[in-house]
Amino acid sequence: MTTCVWCGRMVTPTVTLATLWHWQPLSTPAVCAACQNRLQPLHAPQCPRCARQQTTTQVCHDCVRWGDAWVNHAIFPYDAVLKAYMQQYKFQGDYRLRVVMQPYIRRALARETYDVLVPIPVTAGTWLTRGFNQVTGWLTDQPFQQVLTVDDAHKPRPQSSKTRQERLRSPQPFQLAPAAEKILPNQHVLLLDDVYTTGRTLRHAAAQIYLGGAKAVTSLTLAR
Amino acid sequence: MDKSQLFGRRLPLDQAPPEGHGIPALRQVNGRWQCQRCQQWIGVNDYLPHRIPYCRHCLNLGRLTSHTKLYTIPEPNQFATLTHSPLTWQGQLSPQQRIAAQAVLRLTQAGRNQLLWAVTGAGKTEIGFPALAWALQRGWRVAWTSPRVDVCLELAPRLARAFAVPQAVLYGDQPRPYTYCPLTICTTHQLLRFEAAFDWVIVDEVDAFPLATSPLLQLAVRRAQKPTGSHLYLTATPGQDLQRQIRRHQLAVTYLPLRHHGYLLPPLRVKLVANWQSQLDQQRLPGNLLRQVRQYQQTGQRYLLFVPHVKDLARVQQALRRAGIEGGVTVHAADPQRQAKVQAFRERRVSGLVTTTILERGVTFPAVCVLILGGDDLVFSTAALVQIAGRVGRQRDHPGGDVICYATSQTRTIQRAQAMINALNRRGRRLGGRCP
């Protein structure tokens, strides 16, 4: 008998004839069915650029204002359920909750075409307090390259505490790691981040990666 | 930081304070990690990268890892002993209440662990007042806690009016920061932040969720109390465990089997119904339940109908509508209009309320009858059933009313609930209680 990592309720493994026939240990899901049902993935119609959930399939207002052809894919809408999840996982630092999203990230990455996977890094200060990078926590065994670095001086306070205008004005926080020049040239890079809010962070990261010689950059985020 | 913040507490700090004793927040015992705040074992998968363990049990109070340190300064009781009683409460206790209050005061003075077993609607809070006044006058540090935050929120202004001492109110998202006070009102979760701090701990609704089923919180209550301290449990429905302690004389007990108006508790009647669950699946309700509700409709009697689960609410309402009974509303814990609906029922704007166990305790409606659908469901514990029965007849003008439980069988929980009500009524009759 195990409990759901998210809500703590009991989870009982489903026993079917097939599981009995294979005579393998019963695999209990880490997340209960109720929590699984609360997570509702994004569905059509979406903005073709940033994957925002909307009523039409036209390019959304924010993407028009950006004026570029950035393509972002996302898995979930950033609704109350995802906010609660991010609150517990990222801000309270419950690293165990990474297993909730691992299957979703695995399936989403399998659908993407890319050469190099680059997760958005966290600052050294965040590493000290949080103790983990929330993005790489979702990766199970997918290879990734940490070609970006970020320092605390550029992030005096977290993005999530700023207004939209402040976020859009924020300066470039990323640098290329020394190893980048060997990895990036002529590669299709996929950036992985937790939430796409204004798109500012991802575009900052992409600008640096293009400088490193990549031929294309797209992104995947857990939530939009 | 003011050092009084650490008196009798157990706080994780980034920097070591000038005074105080620090211990690692997580300790390794025989290869397993144990959290020093909540005393729970760390799960085998609860690690950060680089194999740093962290505690998921008390995560809500701020994450503790093996790198965190907890600081404490032993409780010094820096309160002046008062020359006169801090009790400013002007109310009058009934003769029965006064006898109970005297008994509680005597046991407190003797430093005994005790239980005040008073029926629902007996006025437990006020019975504790004389003993609390005595303790505060002696310069004791006292915590008045409850597992339920709404109890704490309701209690804090009452205690502020009744006692002229500074008080700190602590709960999940409290607006005011912690201060060192002789009287602390908090949820039982907040007690995890204290260590050997209180001379006297009062636990209100000791049998309520989640304290009754949580070893973590039960330990928190014991650890927040000083080794020389004592505790007072307040409840109308002590669980099996507390009743065992009473039988073994490990816990002193004061009974108050009569309500403030002097009438006995209405008995719990059981009516057997065949398979109410499958009837509900077909959007039907047991015939005798429907007849009862119809009768209430004709006489204008208001009723509470308790159902086991949130998902039953809509089905029961549809079944009632199909049977031609209108005027009922449903309410559950996550209902955004919960307060408004309960208020509408209180003001007699609706005739019936279909509810889950959220209204089992802490609410008073004048002149209601109570129906319980599926009293054999696991949700209805003995304590829940007695509490639900206690919603009836709380007022002097309407001391009686029906409490009818519809169940497929007489389960042990139902029998225990009936036995508890009967035992309290036997004691009450000896004290001159009248049948309503």
Residue ranges and their predicted role:
Chain B
Residues 27-80:
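Interdomain "pre-motor" coupling segment immediately N-terminal to P-loop NTPase/helicase cores
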Residues 117-125, 135, 140-155, 282-286, ...:
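Conserved strand-helix element at the start of the C-terminal RecA-like helicase core
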Residues 89-112:
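N-terminal pre-P-loop "Q-motif" helix
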Residues 205-208, 342, 346-351, 355-399, ...:
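Conserved RecA-like helicase motor core of SF1/SF2 enzymes
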Residues 153, 168-179, 328-356:
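Conserved helicase ATPase core of P-loop NTP-dependent helicases/translocases
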Residues 226-241, 389-420:
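Conserved segment of the helicase C-terminal RecA-like domain
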Residues 196-272:
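Post-DEXD/H (motif II) to motif III coupling segment of the RecA-like Helicase ATP-binding lobe
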Residues 159-194, 341:
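Inter-Walker segment of RecA-like/P-loop motor cores
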